[in-house]
Amino acid sequence: MKLLPKILALSLAMVVTTSVAANQLANEKTAISVNYKNNRYPLLQKPYIELPIGSIRPTGWMQEQLVRMKNGMTGNLDQVYEKVMGPRNGWLGGDGDVWERGPYWIDGLLPLAYILNDQALIDKVKPWVEWTLASQKPNGYFGPDTDRSYEPGLQRDNSRDWWPKMVMMKVMQQYYSATGDTRVIDFFTRYFKYQLAELPQNPLGKWTFWGEQRGGDNLMVVYWLYNITGDKFLLDLGELIHKQTFNWTDIFLNQDHLSRQLSLHCVNLAQGFKEPVVYYQQNQDPKQICAVKKAVKDIHNTIGLPTGLWGGDELLRFGEPTTGSELCTAVEMMFSLEEMLEITGDVQWADYLERVAYNALPTQVTDDYSARQYYQQT
């Protein structure tokens, strides 16, 4: 189950914090700035650089939307969904939900809090951040580590799964972007050393297939840290994570998944879409870019919908008028397109992003952000 706060904060906060052009100096295709870090060699230089969270303050319509989110479910999910997001949550040290749902909420709430500079929201976010930092063990592992018996409405098993940690990594990356808290750098360095040692024996797909199919989310944070520290082991880890991740490049170039119903999970496709481009920064093989461009064409002819998304009620469906598309698919595809635009500078991805943002997304939430529709029909 994906959650409204993560969905909306991620997609709307994108408008005020996403990648923007930095100073264009010697090479018009490369963003160079003394204030913000581009990719460190040997990673491919990016034409756009993401500004820190909070460096741009919303006004007008955008501010109104974010305030509505604050007053809606995004800012109040700990009350609306207290069983999962309350003090029993495993990411607060409790005996309740230990998987993705808590991190997903904070993935949206944290940027919303710091973009609005809203102390009440920041106070809600900080216990999750502080518990996560304090949970790290000497070997680098972090997060819940105890599986418990089933309880209706809660996910209390697979506590050591790699996937929910990928969501929390994104939370911690955003926290650093907003605050500059240097504890985050040591936290990630220790965790990535743990991953490098642990993944050969316990790969991304050991506990669930989600980590294997969404490994690109892990990979992008590894590169982010490498650009800050320059630690060479991170490049080795990048290769290992890519190798263990579902081979989206081959899926897009050589296989027929996009012409078969039920072949993939619809949100995994949206999240996996960026992985070839994220990895392209390290291996710089043009086939990674060719793969995602081919995928766009294939989707248009089979499972695609006019919104730019695809049919999928969990699993892929052909793009027929009666076929639904998940709200989760919309925002995860938007995030993938943001990353792809930042890395390549190709305005094709900006156009695609706009198409999804203004056609798919608005139909699936109420104006006051108090409710959302899981599936939409075109």
Question: For each predicted feature, which ranges?
Answer:
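Bacterial N-terminal signal peptides
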Residues: A9-T17
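Bacterial N-terminal signal peptides that target proteins for export
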Residues: M1-L8
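Glycan-recognition and catalytic cores of secretory/periplasmic carbohydrate-active enzymes
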Residues: N23-T378
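Hydrophobic transmembrane signal anchors and adjacent membrane-proximal interface regions, especially
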Residues: K2, V15, T245-F246
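Non-catalytic N-terminal targeting/anchoring module and adjacent flexible stem/linker
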Residues: I7, A22-N23
